[in-house]
Amino acid sequence: MPSTTLSTVLSDINEFVVKQGHGVKGLSELGLQTLPNQYVHPPEERLSSMDVVSDDSIPVIDVSNWEDPKVAKLICDAAEKRGFFQIVNHGIPLEMLEKAKAATYRFFREPAEEKKKYSKENCPTSHVRYSTSFLPQIEKALEWKDHLSMFYVSDEEAAQYWPPSCRDDALEYLKSCEMVSRKLLEALMQGLNVNEIDDAKESLLMGSRRININYYPKCPNPDLTVGVGRHSDISTLTLLLQDDIGGLYVRKLEHEAWSHVPPVKGALVINIGDALQIMSNGRYKSIEHRVLANETNDRISVPVFVNPKPNDIVGPLPEVLASGEKPVYKPVLYSDYAKHFYRKAHNGKDTIAFARIE
């Protein structure tokens, strides 16, 4: 692209990246030598190598025998002590994982004109959203990331509204995660003295699901920006499929230090969300995490968010409080909690205060 055109693009980043649908991927492909100012984050929001603990590791749990009490204990221990862990031998074939990643590339390689059909301004449903950064309309500094979010309502709605380039493989993968989510939650509920997941509990724990496909293009100055800023998820659980590039960092519990989550072939990264931290009255931990940009490789990831239904009331479970434990959180309408999260830029774990009893 001629330098004059590049200058024009840089003079109105929002027009090119957001309105025209090129995303940050399109910006990266212009051959940038330096990072545009709109993506430069303040030093306190960048991750220094001094803050990274290299000898720390996230647990990797073999769940080939879901019924083994030792497996359930490992899952509960990881949820209490780390909030993040990886699982292997989970039952989803490697071929299906690869198809989900391939579907991600197919969508993001579509022309901008095709991708922008799914933007907030153009898509006929709010359940599908192509966007860049997190909340570009209010963020002081943008994140170096594009994403497509698909909220699952029904197969019929997915057939009508999800992008054809990724729809079938994304839907198949989302459904395959349902069994894994259920097995994880059965184990986690045992640790909270919940012996059975009845219909009401099922709605509360996993009543709604959303799949995102994320694209992090290579960046000219990765040390000046972020792929995703510090935040915790508001889900019950998040199941993340990552590629082999790396870049996900997790905050150590009660520390300022951060640990890298190394890619493990065939693994899923599991993290506890705010909803489950609230339901467990703080026993299970929803931990801050972030994604770094990198200079040499494009990176993709596919998170599946398992959530309560929007009209569910989320609070400490009765079984958790049955022994007389004092509630740390008040009951909140899940849709209100989600609205609180989406009204501001990523800012650590601030959202949990919305439900905390002062």
Swiss-Prot record:
It is an enzyme of class 1 (oxidoreductase). It catalyses: (E)-4-coumaroyl-CoA + 2-oxoglutarate + O2 = (E)-2,4-dihydroxycinnamoyl-CoA + succinate + CO2; (E)-feruloyl-CoA + 2-oxoglutarate + O2 = (E)-6-hydroxyferuloyl-CoA + succinate + CO2. Keywords: Dioxygenase, Iron, Metal-binding, Oxidoreductase. 2-oxoglutarate (OG)- and Fe(II)-dependent dioxygenase (2OGD) involved in scopoletin and umbelliferone biosynthesis. Converts feruloyl CoA into 6'-hydroxyferuloyl CoA, and p-coumaroyl CoA into 2,4-dihydroxycinnamoyl-CoA, but has no activity with caffeoyl-CoA. This is Bi-functional coumaroyl CoA and feruloyl CoA ortho-hydroxylase F6H2-1-1. Induction: Transiently induced by fungal (F.oxysporum f.sp. batatas O-17) and chitosan treatments, in association with the accumulation of umbelliferone and its glucoside (skimmin) in the tubers. One of its GO terms (biological process) is response to fungus. Binds 1 Fe(2+) ion per subunit. Optimum pH is 7.2. Belongs to the iron/ascorbate-dependent oxidoreductase family. Residues 207-308 form the Fe2OG dioxygenase domain. Mostly expressed in underground stems and stems, and, at low levels, in tubers, leaves and petioles. 2-oxoglutarate binds at residues 216, 299, 301. GO terms for molecular function: 2-oxoglutarate-dependent dioxygenase activity; 4-coumaroyl 2'-hydroxylase activity; metal ion binding. Its EC number is 1.14.11.61, 1.14.11.62. Fe cation binds at residues 231, 233, 289. The keyword Iron applies. Pathway: Phenylpropanoid metabolism. It comes from Ipomoea batatas (Sweet potato). Its cofactor is L-ascorbate; Fe(2+).
